[in-house]
């Protein structure tokens, strides 16, 4: 049975080669981008939003994407203008030109997130300017999903920043231009221009000249 199935799929691969699959994925993502851009504030020229992309928070019109930027598949863009009884009318996400946002990224804002030009992110990156409640005894007795959103301020990521796989950038952080953040790091404080950071919490491990 196993040999038979291998034979069948070998035949299928002749009529449906991988290059054709890639072409069809390209067409699918182009069509999907033309559809989903109608729900956002602005999507620039030659930008692609790959299928699927989940929009959360009700503030889709406050999401702006620059030119020649790609949002890879299975990403989540959450712009929370309302969460329960809370109102965040100025919540926004702005992504610059020539960026590549990796697969399974989660970008969530109730304040503001600004991502500069030429930014590269790996897979499973979290960029969040908010969290669910604090650490008081009263809040801990509430289910996390029902706690109020709290933010220490917006996030700014400078031009040409590279965030490795599974990096988390948390509320109130500013990352300077040309900075590299190693995989699995958790950024809780500001990072200057031209440095490499790693660890939990992220610390500067090298200055880049």
Which ranges hold each PLM region?
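Domain-scale signature associated with acetyltransferase and cell-envelope carbohydrate enzymes
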Residues: 1-129, 155-159, 167, 177, ...
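A short acidic, glycine-rich active-site loop
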Residues: 89, 142-155
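Conserved beta-strand->loop/alpha-helix structural units within folded catalytic cores of enzymes
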Residues: 165, 170-171
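Active-site/ligand-binding-proximal alpha/beta "capping" segment
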Residues: 174
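Active-site nucleotide-sugar/metal-binding loop of Leloir-type enzymes
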Residues: 189
């Amino acid at each position: 049975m196993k040999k038979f199935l291998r034979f069948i799929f070998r035949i299928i691969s002749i009529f449906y080669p991988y290059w054709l699959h890639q072409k069809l994925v390209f067409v699918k993502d182009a069509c999907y981008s033309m559809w989903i851009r109608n729900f956002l504030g602005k999507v620039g020229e030659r930008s692609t939003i790959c299928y699927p992309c989940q929009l959360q928070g009700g503030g889709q019109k406050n999401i702006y994407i620059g030119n020649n930027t790609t949002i890879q598949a299975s990403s989540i863009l959450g712009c929370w203008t309302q969460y329960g009884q809370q109102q965040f009318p100025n919540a926004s996400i702005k992504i610059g030109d020539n960026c590549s946002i990796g697969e399974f990224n989660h970008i969530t804002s109730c304040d503001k997130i600004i991502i500069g030009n030429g930014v590269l992110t790996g897979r499973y990156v979290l960029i969040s300017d908010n969290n669910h409640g604090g650490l008081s005894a009263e809040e801990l007795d509430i289910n996390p999903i029902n706690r109020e959103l709290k933010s220490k301020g917006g996030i700014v990521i400078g031009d040409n920043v590279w965030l490795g796989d599974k990096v988390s950038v948390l509320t109130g952080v500013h990352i300077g231009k040309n900075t590299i953040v190693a995989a699995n790091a958790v950024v809780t404080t500001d990072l200057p221009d031209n440095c490499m950071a790693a660890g939990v919490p992220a610390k500067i491990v090298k200055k880049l000249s």
